[in-house]
């Protein structure tokens, strides 16, 4: 920040972006360039009086020159545009004129930088040969999710304050250290807030840009869109058997299970196999040297967590235990195994990792900015919310490493868990589902195919689930509140996550928390029904 001292613009930006402040006292010539992708320079001067000097000082100009020679610089000015004539604008990557040094100007500028607010203004004066009167570009916000007044989408703004209250009460009651909550309607965000902190030590506030371990939301955010595409292309049918999809399932008790059965959780596949327990010492749950080392090597190359590496064949041994697992009687049995099995089918067919398939087919087309497997490849720890202090397997604080034990043995990339994301990116994927495969001019799959996946096929057998999606319980009592439509769909995650979309009201709800920190034994989120109560409040806020 140059010019007048001010924290407001930085605080507004920090809610949207994972940013750090460069102090004026820094030696800019010795800046660690690898640490920053770009630098935002704001210049603020009082606009209360025309007699107040609002020009850039010589020191300001030198700082801008130094920074722009090292890294991409976004210059945001809250002052008279005539002052820009003294700056070498050729080195500036982006220039945003906000004019007014007030709260509205700072708020609008912060949203414009992250693509949530339109930019339509033109220069009212000429400031250089290159930037003349009338210059300027028009940038529209992402075609999805502009931020709007709740009333514009038929929502009572005052009623939403009850969600704020419930969130704060939940944090005070140690339901979770913090949370992100988003609600959208008609493709527009009317509620998007962060509450609390990363941990109960309150050292770092939750930002909207922070990412959470979303646990089983991975099933519908990563694996399911790819499977729907495969179905849409005729590569997978509902009556396709596991044995026909991959030879690894032949001559096993899972050979004849159909895609429809396993993805509707009707096949009798058991909920999970705690394979990791076999790799620990019984007396103290410490990793056995037979399977783990604290240093990476050719033989121990599966990164389980910080400073813990699994043996090269550990994932194979685990997968064999999943294939060899017993079957229960057919009926609704929610399980992690179906999406793990389908991950194998996809990876074997395309000779690509699920991570690569997700990036190629989902993340890049949707322009997701904050959704990753193995997030430490993309983010600093400060922007990742920890999930647990693990004293039963990895013996470490889990931050940036998947919480789920089965996914952990798989190196963090799995069909059932492993994805990290924030509320905004999740809402994008849910909006794509809500629009039945269409998003911003792209068609991910046909609407007819989506309808087939959002249908309950085993309702008469007492199974509420669709193909991959969770659905409301017919008589209530589930994650959703009783008044939600049967057409609605979504999923929940073990770490304290939840997302739901309703085609009838066109409302999307995203709730992220780390209720498992510091211990997954904390069940207050479920016991106090926080997510369901918040969803009910959203529906009670509907005006029309």
PLM features per residue range, with description:
Residues 254-486:
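Short, surface-exposed loop or secondary-structure junction motifs
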Residues 45-48, 79-84, 101-103, 220, ...:
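Solvent-exposed loop/turn segments at secondary-structure junctions
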